[in-house]
Amino acid sequence: MEIAPQEAPPVPGADGDIEEAPAEAGSPSPASPPADGRLKAAAKRVTFPSDEDIVSGAVEPKDPWRHAQNVTVDEVIGAYKQACQKLNCRQIPKLLRQLQEFTDLGHRLDCLDLKGEKLDYKTCEALEEVFKRLQFKVVDLEQTNLDEDGASALFDMIEYYESATHLNISFNKHIGTRGWQAAAHMMRKTSCLQYLDARNTPLLDHSAPFVARALRIRSSLAVLHLENASLSGRPLMLLATALKMNMNLRELYLADNKLNGLQDSAQLGNLLKFNCSLQILDLRNNHVLDSGLAYICEGLKEQRKGLVTLVLWNNQLTHTGMAFLGMTLPHTQSLETLNLGHNPIGNEGVRHLKNGLISNRSVLRLGLASTKLTCEGAVAVAEFIAESPRLLRLDLRENEIKTGGLMALSLALKVNHSLLRLDLDREPKKEAVKSFIETQKALLAEIQNGCKRNLVLAREREEKEQPPQLSASMPETTATEPQPDDEPAAGVQNGAPSPAPSPDSDSDSDSDGEEEEEEEGERDETPCPALVPPTDSLGPGDRSPPGSPSTPTEQRISVSSPGRGHKVFVVTRVESPPERAEPPASPTPPSPPPPPSPPASPSLPPAGAIDTRDTGSSEPQPPPEPPRSGPPLPNGLKPEFALALPPEPPPGPEVKGGSCGLEHELSCSKNEKELEELLLEASQESGQETL
């Protein structure tokens, strides 16, 4: 029995009907389908409507600030209270008081301070009625007990409404992974956010990738505080890797993170090799150690420009690490502030550091507070002071510097005309001979007078050369009149977290926070004091542009206020021509500053300083030569840092040798014999103390 073949079912089109191709003009239509019962593929046609017919309509995105047009304080307060009633949450009295005090609502308001308020999810949701109507420079959410839900909601609002340029989320330990994920999205999407303070807010392994991705791709952040954020290990590795490609971040604070001297320090050193835009790196209260400092120095050595401030306060550094740093300093061209306080460096470490500092061309501030220095170390520091025509601030507090060391420092200040602040302990040290106590007081007064003399000269030159910029003085020159009972100089912030001013600091220590000083032009929005924590470094500095015109007798130094980084001060130092008669030279056009690498011999001190080097010492001092061989250190550290220590000199005549070196440097043509006798007595006293 034969079964007749059945026709294939029709092929439905897009609308469920049979789609037949229209017959082409002039060609006969097929009389019957193919034998297999299917339509030919070539017979199908697909058509689309014209571009004008595709889009039937368009809706513009909602304007985030549509509620902020001609808004009044009463409207904001009413909307906030209504939202609290709708969400059945409590109103924040602190917020209501601030809202009532606001006047000009058309611009960014200074600060929204919610510090210490407990913010749950519903309370955060009610805040949207404020954020959709008002924008702020600073939003302070410190210690507000945020959880994942509340943090996510707040960060989404701040990102959508661009509510803040400076945000403080410190001391919120429970924002969790979702909170950090929302924070990372805010960092990536908010172009106005410049400052983020996340101190004591843990950034753990599962949250770090979100923040790292935000910092690597697109981030407008210029300042990032991550103190005590549990970064050691994988979080720091992700963060450092991302920051290699970040060109916007200027300040990075990583204190109290238990960073170690191997993997963590290697990541930081690698970061410095590739990132030349980072200006401040604060590593205080970590465990960098000498091995970690070697990695950091290796990164610094490869920088042509970049880091301006390096804070290594309390990192268990010894004289071994100072050998690495002494090799690196001649090669650094931008480092202006170096804080080594509270490290057991000792006299030997300062000797290793001295030659590098003398060959350096950029360091303006040096912190050596509580570094176990004695008179011997003070003599080495005095040699550097006598050679340096650019050092502005020096901190030597909490060291056992007695009569001999003070005498060396006093003599060095006689030939130095740049040092404006020298911090020493106010009370004299105990001496075996009671008469030396009075000698110490007299020497402290001489040192104080020397700094005041330099300060007055700098102020006079600034007023003479730059009358339009009278208010933009350096922090060292902000005091109106030196007080007779002040310490030897204004206090240099030494890097230790200090909730209250120490008794060793005077009114000049806080002068950089006064309102009469001009703000830096690039930052016209200054955060309120509730957000900006005190930075205890010696202070970031902003160097003058390399192409700025300068003459052989005039040098302009631009430095920032210590601890802020938001204010800039300018001082002009004019060097008078030598007293001896010279034939008139033809005027020369301004020349760019000489390249600092390889380092040449230090330039002559300013007017009044006497060149005491003999003809044999006029040649450039070469930097210490790296060792020829040595086993490499782990993590790819160069072998030259492994054997950087110079040979150990004999212990006997070492003290006198250092003192004699200073004696030769400070000898003057007029009172040479008198200075030699005074310095010889100081060296003998310091030698007796060390025995």
UniProtKB/Swiss-Prot annotation:
GO molecular function, one term: protein phosphatase inhibitor activity
Residue stretches of biased makeup (Pro residues): 584-605, 620-634
Keywords tagged on the record: Leucine-rich repeat, Phosphoprotein, Protein phosphatase inhibitor, Repeat
Residue spans of the LRR repeats: 220-240, 248-269, 277-297, 306-326, 334-354
Tagged with keyword Phosphoprotein: yes
CDD domains from the UniProt entry: LRR_RI
Bias type Polar residues, positions: 468-481
Record field: compositional bias (Acidic residues): 505-523
Phosphoserine carried by residues: S50, S56, S561
Highest rank taxon of the organism: Eukaryota
Annotated stretches, region: Disordered: 1-43, 460-662
UniProt family annotation: Belongs to the PPP1R37 family.
Function: Inhibits phosphatase activity of protein phosphatase 1 (PP1) complexes.
PANTHER family documented for this protein: LEUCINE-RICH REPEAT, ISOFORM F-RELATED (PTHR24112), PROTEIN PHOSPHATASE 1 REGULATORY SUBUNIT 37 (PTHR24112:SF9)
Assembly and binders: Interacts with PPP1CA.
Protein name per Swiss-Prot or TrEMBL: Protein phosphatase 1 regulatory subunit 37
Originating species: Homo sapiens
